[in-house]
From Swiss-Prot:
Root EC class: transferase
Catalytic activity: dTMP + ATP = dTDP + ADP
A UniProt-annotated Pfam family: Thymidylate_kin
Superkingdom per UniProt: Archaea
Protein name: Probable thymidylate kinase
Family named by the database record: Belongs to the thymidylate kinase family.
Lineage of origin: Archaea, Methanobacteriati, Methanobacteriota, Thermococci, Thermococcales
Underlying gene: tmk
Positions that bind ATP: 7-14
Amino acid sequence: MFIVLEGIDGAGKSTQAKLLAEWFENRGYEVVLTKEPTDTPFGKLIRRLVLTGGKEGIIDGAKISHEAEALLFAADRAEHVDKLIKPSLEAGKVVISDRYFYSSLAYQWARGLDLEWLIDLNRFAVKPDIVFLLDLPVKESMNRIRSRKVKSEFDKIFELQRKVRENYLKLAEMFPEMKIINAMEDVETVHNQIIALIETLLGEE
């Protein structure tokens, strides 16, 4: 089974991914907990570029284009799918990913790139069984991440986050595997809502 958690920053994706992994492990499943960007060379490059707001460009410190950024994310994802996701699924493991190609669609679409081009660029990606979109108002997102020492370009601009949230909700209408979860609820309530959907998927109602 392949499960993805999505949402704007501060929505609680990492927390819920860990809780979900523990739930599966307690039931005897072998779980692979992963994330995007990954820890591959591509992922490390992306993290460096994002954390510096694109100021550490590849050539002479010049900021890379949004198209180049999208291609880097796709390259990292291709390695992720080929080296970890596919082999793990073929081995019968449960794969839980904190972000996946839906993040690229939401963020890079918000940056002005063509959605169809982004979808085509990520067509190679293995489709998850279910995607939990942890939906959170942007003001609450900014409040939650304010205490973090985050320099990510994604987190700097309120307007970008607003567009990204709108895009996620539009994507949820396009991709039936995406299920919207109210991330304003407390951690336990959100977890229980996720588990209820997982049990339905597993036929354990």
